[in-house]
Amino acid sequence: MKVHLTSLGCAKNQVDSELMLGAFAAEGLTVCDDPAGADVLVVNTCAFIEDAVNEAVDTILALARYKSEGSCRRLIVCGCLPERFGEELAGALPEADFFFGTGAYHRVIEAVAGKESTLSRCTLPPPDAVPMQAAADRRICATPHTVYVKIAEGCDRRCTYCIIPRLRGRQRSRPPADIVVEARGLVAAGAKELVLVAQETTAYGADLSPPVSLASLLMALSDAVGDIWVRVLYMHPDTMDPDLIRVMTERDNLCSYFDVPVQHASDRVLKRMGRRHTAADLHRLFDDIRRADPDAVLRTTVLVGFPGEKPADFEKLLDFITGVAFDHLGAFIYSDDEALSSHGLDGHVSSKTARHRYDRVMTAQIDISSRRLAKRVGSREPVLVEEKAEDGLFFGRAWFQAPEVDGDVCFSGAGDYAPGDRVSVRITGASAYDLTGEAQ
């Protein structure tokens, strides 16, 4: 039997998809890239914001055509969309045969393998009813040299703009020994970069007995994996501490790369968002990081157009962005949804105003990023090769560039470099987000 899986959404969703693909292969099923040739179609969905919901529904309907026009016999929907809408979704999408919430990924294999006699059409246990899945065989969806490792699931916070706790449940951390075992296996299989992800990586281990810290996990991984890059994403300012900063800035194989989404820098807006820190707290945190390592790279995410965001609040955010001078920054426009606590707040910002503020943020960041990247011209940087172009050029990333969200390095060289190779590159040029160079 042939099965095709479409994965939507974030890197954390990608890990769930890779675990399912591993389970399919272990069951003796053939995983195929082309949905037209599959007997069973699976779509792992996202439902974080309205655009993600729309994309998921459109994808399901597009795949459903293979049931009526092709060889597909079964269409299975799993992940955040069924978790959010449940039986309502099943009623609206008769094209799909089975629906599984985020607490039932481990049961998708039953529907795929034709063991559905024990299943109802919708399988929706509480999202946190099942512990984090132990290390298992995965079929890596993207490049085998850069692999995401999910260290925890769920979130205990209640930010008013976020639906994740409802979709993913309370935080559950994986035992550190289990993560180290998986990391060693991935490195043995060819991984050159491990990217740690969770809803909040810096809260890792607080729910374990006895509690452990992200810093202790990173030290164990640093000792275990050798000369590869270990990168951490999705850090929260409230759960960062001096020990974590010290470990990340002192260990050679831990990228001194701090992805800390701040969302805003107006104390009034932060309070409405359900964030517990202040702008002063954020300034102190980033000062501490750069004091520990002046070459540390800072990335953040901000949210503009949040209900009640006044012009003065936005100016505080803009001043904060330019003052800290983040190496990388992503911005989003607030997406209202009746499922959010923020839906009931007053002072909703018009879409025109929100778009204008977004444009101002990104314009400011282009200038900041251009200046910071220009400082790297003339330096020699290790670059992880990701692609060989037909014209003899190569594309890759330096340690200060995370996959998918940051820029890349385009370089020339006489060597026959392959994806996964690490090459010393002299940086010769810089733009707003990307670098050019020559292999040395």
From Swiss-Prot:
Residues of the Radical SAM core domain: 141-371
Entry-linked Gene3D superfamilies: Methylthiotransferase, N-terminal domain (3.40.50.12160), Nucleic acid-binding proteins (2.40.50.140), tm_1862 like domain (3.80.30.20)
Keywords noted in UniProt: 4Fe-4S, Cytoplasm, Iron, Iron-sulfur, Metal-binding, S-adenosyl-L-methionine, Transferase
A single GO cellular-component term on record: cytosol
Record: residues binding [4Fe-4S] cluster 2: 155, 159, 162
Domain MTTase N-terminal positions: 1-117
Co-factor binding comment: Binds 2 [4Fe-4S] clusters. One cluster is coordinated with 3 cysteines and an exchangeable S-adenosyl-L-methionine.
SMART domains: Elp3
EC top class, as a word: transferase
Binding positions ([4Fe-4S] cluster 1): 10, 46, 80
Subcellular location, record wording: Cytoplasm
One of the record's GO molecular function terms: 4 iron, 4 sulfur cluster binding
E.C. numbers: 2.8.4.4
Cofactors required: [4Fe-4S] cluster
Pfam families with a match to the protein in the record: Radical_SAM, TRAM_2, UPF0004
GO biological process, one term: tRNA modification
Catalytic activity line of the entry: L-aspartate(89)-[ribosomal protein uS12]-hydrogen + (sulfur carrier)-SH + AH2 + 2 S-adenosyl-L-methionine = 3-methylsulfanyl-L-aspartate(89)-[ribosomal protein uS12]-hydrogen + (sulfur carrier)-H + 5'-deoxyadenosine + L-methionine + A + S-adenosyl-L-homocysteine + 2 H(+)
InterPro entries, A to Z: Elp3/MiaA/NifB-like_rSAM, Methylthiotransferase, Methylthiotransferase_CS, Methylthiotransferase_N, Methylthiotransferase_N_sf, NA-bd_OB-fold, Ribosomal_uS12_MeSTrfase_RimO, rSAM
Domain TRAM: 374-440
UniProt family annotation: Belongs to the methylthiotransferase family. RimO subfamily.
Function: Catalyzes the methylthiolation of an aspartic acid residue of ribosomal protein uS12.
Cited NCBIfam families: 30S ribosomal protein S12 methylthiotransferase RimO (TIGR01125), MiaB/RimO family radical SAM methylthiotransferase (TIGR00089)
Name of the molecule in the record: Ribosomal protein uS12 methylthiotransferase RimO
Species the sequence originates in: Desulfosudis oleivorans (strain DSM 6200 / JCM 39069 / Hxd3) (Desulfococcus oleovorans)
Encoding gene (name): rimO
